[in-house]
Amino acid sequence: MKAGIHPEYKAVNATCSCGNSFVFNSTLDKESIHLDVCDKCHPFYTGKQRIVDTGGRVDRFNKRFGALSSGKK
């Protein structure tokens, strides 16, 4: 293989919004990243029913189509 063409492989610290943090190896240029959900707080892994709303998408949907589900016209 050619020398000097491969990206640097280093440790990256990932921090979740729930407070969980872990280190993994990656070719990212950043030393740390922030996550919205991880395996400790994701509804699929915890078994708890929870809506993960990023950017108000659920509110926007309910504002546009909420009248249809409530029977109002």
UniProtKB/Swiss-Prot annotation:
Ordered alphabetically, the record's keywords are: Metal-binding, Ribonucleoprotein, Ribosomal protein, RNA-binding, rRNA-binding, Zinc
According to its UniProt entry, one GO biological process term is:
translation
- Pfam families, from UniProt? Ribosomal_L31 (PF01197)
Query: Where does the signal peptide begin and end?
Result: none
Q: Which GO terms describe its molecular function?
A: metal ion binding; rRNA binding; structural constituent of ribosome
Q: Which GO terms describe its cellular component?
A: ribonucleoprotein complex; ribosome
Textual note on the cofactor: Binds 1 zinc ion per subunit.
Give the matching PROSITE patterns: RIBOSOMAL_L31
What positions does the entry give for Zn(2+) binding?
16, 18, 38, 41
**Source superkingdom:** Bacteria
Q: Which InterPro entries match?
A: Ribosomal_bL28/bL31-like_sf, Ribosomal_bL31, Ribosomal_bL31_A, Ribosomal_bL31_sf
Its needed co-factors are: Zn(2+)
Q: Does the keyword Repeat apply?
A: no
- Can you state the subunit structure given in the record? Part of the 50S ribosomal subunit.
Q: Tell me, what does this protein do in biology?
A: Binds the 23S rRNA.
Task: Supply the HAMAP family for this chain.
Answer: Ribosomal_bL31_1 (MF_00501)
The family note in this entry says:
Belongs to the bacterial ribosomal protein bL31 family. Type A subfamily.
Spell out the protein name for this chain. Answer: Large ribosomal subunit protein bL31
Q: Which organism is it from?
A: Vibrio vulnificus (strain CMCP6)
